[in-house]
Amino acid sequence: MPTKVAHVVLAARDPQVSAAFYTEVLGMQRVWDFDQLDMVFFSFGERDHDLALIKAPEDAPLGNQGFSHVAFEVEGGEEELRRLYRRLLDYGSDVELKADHGLSKSIYFLDPDGNRLEFFYPTMEPDAAMDFMRAGRAGLDPYDIEPASASA
């Protein structure tokens, strides 16, 4: 049985242009350009690749074509989430939602191609989080988080 998401491939109008978002905002390493298929591969440094961008058809609309979002867990809790929030704003990204799910706290935002992404940090240990979910207690409460100061 599958146990985790190994990688995600997103369609991008121009993978070369969108690549800057993934390196500059998410801090990913650009590991390979597969020119034959107009793809760019990225890694967080522990795997050969975690995410790839592939050229979308010329007439493809922006946004979620067949999926909701991709979530990226962050280490460092709220302080790191605030830093990433600042980075998103500095990049000009659209932050859509700030949510407290009970077992995690999240910021949802769009990449340059309108794909919805999420940064989150867990607020409880995995076993407790599983019990929390199974009990139907996870939610979508507002999360009052401010971005880190511009100098952070």
Where are the language model's segments positioned?
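Short, solvent-exposed beta-strand edge segments and adjacent coil->beta transition regions
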Residues: 3-7, 65-69
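Core segments of cupin and vicinal oxygen chelate
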Residues: 10-51, 55
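Vicinal oxygen chelate
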Residues: 12-16, 71-116, 121-127, 138-152
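Short beta-turn/strand-loop junction motif enriched in small, turn-promoting residues
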Residues: 27-28, 58, 93-94
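Short beta-strand micro-motifs in enzyme catalytic cores
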Residues: 38-40, 68, 105-107
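Acetyl-CoA-dependent GNAT
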Residues: 54-58, 122
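Short glycine/serine/proline-enriched coil/turn segments at secondary-structure junctions
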Residues: 60-63
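Polybasic, low-complexity binding patches
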Residues: 131-137
